[in-house]
Amino acid sequence: MAVICYALRVKIELMKFSMEIRQNIIESHDRVWDELAKPGAVLSGEERIAVAREIRAARTCRFCIENKGSLGLSPGLGEHESTDPSFPKARLELIHRLMNDPGRITRAWVDNLRAEGLGDVEYVEIASLVSSVCVVDTFCEALGLELRPLPAAISGKKNYKRPATAEDEGAYVPMIAVDMLQDDYSDLYDLNHWVPNVHRAFSLIPDVVRLADDLMASHYFPYESVPRYADQNHEYAVSKTQMELIASRVSINNDCFY
Protein backbone atom coordinates (compact mmCIF):
# COMPACT_ATOMS: atom_id res chain seq x y z
CA MET A 1 0.00 0.00 0.00
CA ALA A 2 2.85 2.40 0.86
CA VAL A 3 4.39 1.80 -2.57
CA ILE A 4 1.06 2.46 -4.30
CA CYS A 5 0.57 5.68 -2.33
CA TYR A 6 4.10 6.79 -3.18
CA ALA A 7 3.50 6.10 -6.88
CA LEU A 8 0.34 8.19 -6.80
CA ARG A 9 2.15 11.07 -5.09
CA VAL A 10 4.91 10.91 -7.69
CA LYS A 11 2.36 11.01 -10.51
CA ILE A 12 0.62 14.00 -8.92
CA GLU A 13 3.90 15.86 -8.46
CA LEU A 14 4.97 15.12 -12.02
CA MET A 15 1.66 16.39 -13.34
CA LYS A 16 2.20 19.55 -11.30
CA PHE A 17 5.62 20.17 -12.85
CA SER A 18 4.84 18.70 -16.29
CA MET A 19 7.88 16.48 -15.99
CA GLU A 20 8.32 12.88 -17.03
CA ILE A 21 10.83 10.54 -15.42
CA ARG A 22 12.29 7.89 -17.69
CA GLN A 23 10.85 4.47 -16.94
CA ASN A 24 14.27 2.84 -16.56
CA ILE A 25 15.12 5.26 -13.74
CA ILE A 26 11.89 4.49 -11.90
CA GLU A 27 12.50 0.77 -12.32
CA SER A 28 16.09 0.98 -11.09
CA HIS A 29 14.96 2.90 -7.99
CA ASP A 30 12.28 0.28 -7.38
CA ARG A 31 14.94 -2.42 -7.48
CA VAL A 32 17.11 -0.52 -5.00
CA TRP A 33 14.18 -0.34 -2.59
CA ASP A 34 13.31 -4.00 -3.12
CA GLU A 35 16.88 -5.04 -2.32
CA LEU A 36 17.12 -2.64 0.62
CA ALA A 37 14.41 -4.55 2.47
CA LYS A 38 15.99 -7.97 1.95
CA PRO A 39 18.69 -9.66 4.04
CA GLY A 40 22.13 -8.80 2.69
CA ALA A 41 25.49 -10.52 2.68
CA VAL A 42 26.03 -9.76 6.38
CA LEU A 43 23.18 -7.54 7.54
CA SER A 44 19.62 -8.64 8.18
CA GLY A 45 16.72 -6.82 6.55
CA GLU A 46 16.10 -4.96 9.81
CA GLU A 47 19.76 -3.91 10.03
CA ARG A 48 19.74 -2.67 6.43
CA ILE A 49 16.69 -0.49 7.11
CA ALA A 50 18.42 0.83 10.24
CA VAL A 51 21.44 1.72 8.08
CA ALA A 52 19.14 3.58 5.67
CA ARG A 53 17.71 5.62 8.56
CA GLU A 54 21.21 6.59 9.64
CA ILE A 55 22.13 7.50 6.06
CA ARG A 56 19.28 9.99 5.98
CA ALA A 57 20.10 11.37 9.42
CA ALA A 58 23.80 11.78 8.56
CA ARG A 59 23.12 14.53 6.05
CA THR A 60 22.37 17.04 8.81
CA CYS A 61 24.88 15.81 11.42
CA ARG A 62 26.30 18.91 13.15
CA PHE A 63 29.45 17.05 14.20
CA CYS A 64 30.18 16.20 10.55
CA ILE A 65 29.47 19.75 9.42
CA GLU A 66 31.94 21.13 11.96
CA ASN A 67 34.62 18.58 11.05
CA LYS A 68 34.22 19.26 7.35
CA GLY A 69 35.87 22.63 7.85
CA SER A 70 38.92 21.32 9.71
CA LEU A 71 42.30 20.97 8.02
CA GLY A 72 43.54 17.78 9.69
CA LEU A 73 42.77 14.15 8.90
CA SER A 74 41.51 13.39 12.41
CA PRO A 75 38.04 14.53 13.51
CA GLY A 76 37.50 16.79 16.49
CA LEU A 77 36.02 15.72 19.79
CA GLY A 78 32.36 14.84 19.71
CA GLU A 79 29.87 12.26 18.47
CA HIS A 80 27.82 11.73 15.34
CA GLU A 81 24.10 12.32 15.54
CA SER A 82 22.11 9.10 15.33
CA THR A 83 18.50 7.97 15.21
CA ASP A 84 19.29 5.10 17.57
CA PRO A 85 21.68 5.32 20.56
CA SER A 86 22.31 1.56 20.31
CA PHE A 87 23.39 1.67 16.66
CA PRO A 88 26.93 0.18 16.34
CA LYS A 89 29.55 2.94 16.52
CA ALA A 90 31.80 1.52 13.78
CA ARG A 91 28.88 1.33 11.34
CA LEU A 92 27.83 4.86 12.27
CA GLU A 93 31.34 6.22 11.68
CA LEU A 94 31.49 4.51 8.28
CA ILE A 95 28.13 5.89 7.20
CA HIS A 96 28.89 9.45 8.27
CA ARG A 97 32.38 9.53 6.77
CA LEU A 98 31.14 8.15 3.44
CA MET A 99 28.20 10.56 3.39
CA ASN A 100 29.91 13.73 4.52
CA ASP A 101 33.69 13.54 4.28
CA PRO A 102 34.87 10.74 1.95
CA GLY A 103 37.91 12.73 0.86
CA ARG A 104 39.52 12.04 4.23
CA ILE A 105 39.14 8.27 4.25
CA THR A 106 42.57 6.76 4.85
CA ARG A 107 43.94 3.25 5.24
CA ALA A 108 44.59 3.90 8.93
CA TRP A 109 40.95 4.92 9.38
CA VAL A 110 39.72 1.76 7.63
CA ASP A 111 42.11 -0.38 9.71
CA ASN A 112 40.68 1.20 12.85
CA LEU A 113 37.16 0.22 11.80
CA ARG A 114 38.40 -3.34 11.31
CA ALA A 115 39.93 -3.28 14.79
CA GLU A 116 36.50 -2.31 16.11
CA GLY A 117 35.02 -5.43 14.51
CA LEU A 118 33.78 -4.18 11.14
CA GLY A 119 34.59 -6.87 8.55
CA ASP A 120 35.42 -6.24 4.90
CA VAL A 121 32.16 -7.72 3.58
CA GLU A 122 30.18 -5.63 6.07
CA TYR A 123 32.15 -2.55 4.97
CA VAL A 124 31.27 -3.17 1.31
CA GLU A 125 27.61 -3.85 2.09
CA ILE A 126 27.21 -0.63 4.08
CA ALA A 127 29.13 1.38 1.49
CA SER A 128 26.81 0.06 -1.21
CA LEU A 129 23.75 1.06 0.83
CA VAL A 130 25.13 4.56 1.32
CA SER A 131 25.71 4.83 -2.42
CA SER A 132 22.35 3.53 -3.59
CA VAL A 133 20.12 5.18 -0.98
CA CYS A 134 21.88 8.50 -1.53
CA VAL A 135 21.26 8.26 -5.29
CA VAL A 136 17.54 7.64 -4.85
CA ASP A 137 17.08 10.26 -2.13
CA THR A 138 18.98 13.06 -3.85
CA PHE A 139 17.16 12.34 -7.11
CA CYS A 140 13.83 12.86 -5.35
CA GLU A 141 15.08 16.01 -3.65
CA ALA A 142 16.39 17.46 -6.91
CA LEU A 143 12.90 17.16 -8.42
CA GLY A 144 11.13 18.48 -5.33
CA LEU A 145 9.54 15.10 -4.61
CA GLU A 146 9.02 13.56 -1.19
CA LEU A 147 11.55 10.95 -0.19
CA ARG A 148 10.43 7.40 -0.66
CA PRO A 149 9.19 5.84 2.59
CA LEU A 150 11.59 3.17 3.76
CA PRO A 151 10.27 -0.34 3.06
CA ALA A 152 9.35 -2.89 5.68
CA ALA A 153 12.23 -5.25 6.38
CA ILE A 154 12.01 -8.80 5.07
CA SER A 155 13.05 -11.47 7.54
CA GLY A 156 15.40 -14.34 6.80
CA LYS A 157 19.06 -14.78 6.01
CA LYS A 158 20.77 -14.46 2.65
CA ASN A 159 22.98 -17.30 1.52
CA TYR A 160 26.12 -15.26 0.84
CA LYS A 161 29.17 -17.02 -0.53
CA ARG A 162 32.42 -15.07 -0.52
CA PRO A 163 33.92 -15.02 -4.05
CA ALA A 164 36.83 -17.44 -4.06
CA THR A 165 38.89 -15.21 -6.36
CA ALA A 166 38.45 -11.92 -4.47
CA GLU A 167 41.94 -10.84 -3.46
CA ASP A 168 43.82 -8.04 -1.76
CA GLU A 169 45.20 -5.86 -4.56
CA GLY A 170 46.29 -3.01 -2.33
CA ALA A 171 42.88 -1.34 -2.06
CA TYR A 172 41.03 -0.97 1.24
CA VAL A 173 38.91 -4.07 0.55
CA PRO A 174 39.49 -7.19 -1.60
CA MET A 175 38.21 -7.14 -5.18
CA ILE A 176 37.79 -9.59 -8.05
CA ALA A 177 40.32 -9.04 -10.83
CA VAL A 178 39.09 -8.87 -14.42
CA ASP A 179 40.79 -12.19 -15.25
CA MET A 180 39.45 -13.98 -12.17
CA LEU A 181 35.74 -14.29 -12.97
CA GLN A 182 34.19 -17.70 -12.43
CA ASP A 183 31.14 -19.63 -11.21
CA ASP A 184 28.04 -17.50 -10.58
CA TYR A 185 29.95 -14.26 -11.14
CA SER A 186 31.56 -15.21 -14.46
CA ASP A 187 29.58 -12.43 -16.21
CA LEU A 188 30.18 -9.70 -13.62
CA TYR A 189 32.22 -7.48 -15.98
CA ASP A 190 32.05 -6.86 -19.72
CA LEU A 191 35.51 -8.07 -20.70
CA ASN A 192 35.14 -6.69 -24.22
CA HIS A 193 35.94 -3.27 -22.78
CA TRP A 194 38.18 -1.69 -20.17
CA VAL A 195 36.95 -2.33 -16.62
CA PRO A 196 37.78 0.58 -14.25
CA ASN A 197 38.53 0.01 -10.58
CA VAL A 198 35.37 1.86 -9.58
CA HIS A 199 33.41 -0.84 -11.41
CA ARG A 200 35.14 -3.53 -9.33
CA ALA A 201 34.95 -1.72 -5.97
CA PHE A 202 31.92 -3.65 -4.64
CA SER A 203 32.91 -7.00 -6.18
CA LEU A 204 33.35 -8.70 -2.81
CA ILE A 205 29.52 -8.88 -3.06
CA PRO A 206 28.74 -9.56 -6.75
CA ASP A 207 25.01 -8.84 -6.40
CA VAL A 208 25.88 -5.34 -5.20
CA VAL A 209 27.93 -4.75 -8.36
CA ARG A 210 24.93 -5.74 -10.47
CA LEU A 211 22.65 -3.33 -8.61
CA ALA A 212 25.20 -0.50 -8.89
CA ASP A 213 25.55 -1.22 -12.62
CA ASP A 214 21.78 -0.96 -12.95
CA LEU A 215 21.76 2.48 -11.32
CA MET A 216 24.73 3.59 -13.41
CA ALA A 217 23.10 2.56 -16.68
CA SER A 218 19.72 4.14 -15.90
CA HIS A 219 21.11 7.49 -14.74
CA TYR A 220 24.04 7.77 -17.12
CA PHE A 221 25.41 4.95 -19.30
CA PRO A 222 26.84 1.47 -18.76
CA TYR A 223 30.49 1.61 -17.68
CA GLU A 224 31.74 0.30 -21.01
CA SER A 225 30.00 3.16 -22.87
CA VAL A 226 31.33 6.04 -20.78
CA PRO A 227 34.71 6.57 -22.53
CA ARG A 228 33.28 6.38 -26.04
CA TYR A 229 29.65 7.54 -26.17
CA ALA A 230 28.60 10.40 -28.46
CA ASP A 231 25.40 12.39 -28.83
CA GLN A 232 24.19 10.13 -31.63
CA ASN A 233 24.29 7.19 -29.18
CA HIS A 234 21.53 8.48 -26.89
CA GLU A 235 18.17 10.22 -26.87
CA TYR A 236 18.68 12.29 -23.73
CA ALA A 237 17.49 15.90 -23.68
CA VAL A 238 20.99 17.11 -22.81
CA SER A 239 24.18 16.80 -24.84
CA LYS A 240 27.36 14.96 -23.89
CA THR A 241 29.05 18.27 -23.11
CA GLN A 242 26.22 19.26 -20.78
CA MET A 243 26.20 15.87 -19.07
CA GLU A 244 29.94 15.87 -18.48
CA LEU A 245 29.87 19.44 -17.17
CA ILE A 246 27.17 18.53 -14.66
CA ALA A 247 29.00 15.34 -13.67
CA SER A 248 32.24 17.27 -13.16
CA ARG A 249 30.62 19.91 -11.00
CA VAL A 250 28.83 17.32 -8.86
CA SER A 251 32.09 15.40 -8.45
CA ILE A 252 33.97 18.52 -7.35
CA ASN A 253 31.24 19.47 -4.88
CA ASN A 254 31.38 15.96 -3.39
CA ASP A 255 35.20 15.79 -3.18
CA CYS A 256 35.20 12.98 -5.75
CA PHE A 257 38.28 13.32 -7.92
CA TYR A 258 38.20 9.91 -9.60
Features from the language model and the residues they span:
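Hydrophobic alpha-helical segments
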Residues: 2-258
